[in-house]
Amino acid sequence: MPRFQRLEHGADSKSSIAVMSELNLILLGPPGAGKGTQAARLTEDFHLPYIATGDMLRGAVKEGTPLGKQAKEYMDRGDLVPDDVIIRMILDCMESPDCADGLLLDGYPRNVEQAEALEKAMKGKGRGVTATILIDVPDEEVVKRISGRRLCQKNGHVYNVFSDPPKHDDVCDQDGSRLVQREDDAEDVVRKRLSVYHEQTAPLIEYYEDRGVLKRFDGLRSPTEVHDHIRATIATLRLEDEL
């Protein structure tokens, strides 16, 4: 059986978005949902490369690739890197031998327009989205997870004043240095990030739900429980595709 089927031009998008046995996964969820933790485990489970678009951009710029040079021109001007440049980078990654069995994409798409452009580009390469993994976490829990985070100034040990507090307020248990809150972790900043996330992601969730590839997971469960649920779901998808 071939590793994946070619997508037919003109096929209905709802029926053609996930027809391949390779695993092309998109990771969605609010800040603080634990996406990084789950990504690390899933890439080991299914031997998939993890593509975080921010890291991908920085790596391309550092290596001086043609697309990296293009991206740098926009970044140096303080402009957003256009979607077509980012999508071409993603497609380049897909062409590498490491991505022969699929990939795990985090940080893109962020809105429906980007999702449509990515789908069209992948379709042109005979590929599609197998599943979009959404880790759901309520806003107030996100605020607690992020605004409660404290780092020690000396060695960067991490605490959370709500779920994993130090023995003494604002003092690291391990080296006695002062604990501080990063500016990005302040509650007002977190709430602004959540507002942007919901504005962008609500239509994106509906987009993938309409295509039958959205899989929801309860981010209030322990990281191990979330991982077990995601792994079982993806394993079932792979098994169904091979039948």
Residue ranges: model-predicted function:
Residues 2-243:
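Glycine-rich phosphate-binding loop of ATP-dependent small-molecule kinases
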